[in-house]
Amino acid sequence: MAEEVAELERIFKRFDANGDGKISSSELGETLKTLGSVTPEEIQRMMAEIDTDGDGFISFEEFKDFARANSGLIKDVAKIF
């Protein structure tokens, strides 16, 4: 479990470019662009799905919940990062 959390923290920090402890839509978009083409609509859909409290940012807790529900996707992202 501790290894899983450490890996998620590592990935989260890659997305959290300014280190403020949350991922904005622009940080999400910039990081996803390194993985390939992504549209603004796709970024907004992802934000809406992951940002469960609707504050406009993805917290580590929200990221962790999303990662656990989508472990295959996160494993693929981990391989890239």
From Swiss-Prot:
Keyword list, A-Z: Allergen, Calcium, Metal-binding, Repeat
Domain EF-hand stretches: 3-38, 41-73
Gene3D superfamilies: EF-hand
Alphabetized SMART domains for the sequence: EFh
Residues that coordinate or bind Ca(2+) 1: 16, 18, 20, 22, 27
Single GO MF annotation: calcium ion binding
Pfam family, one: EF-hand_7
Domain of life of the organism encoding this protein: Eukaryota
UniProt KW Repeat keyword: yes
Designated name of the protein: Polcalcin Syr v 3
The organism of origin for this protein: Syringa vulgaris
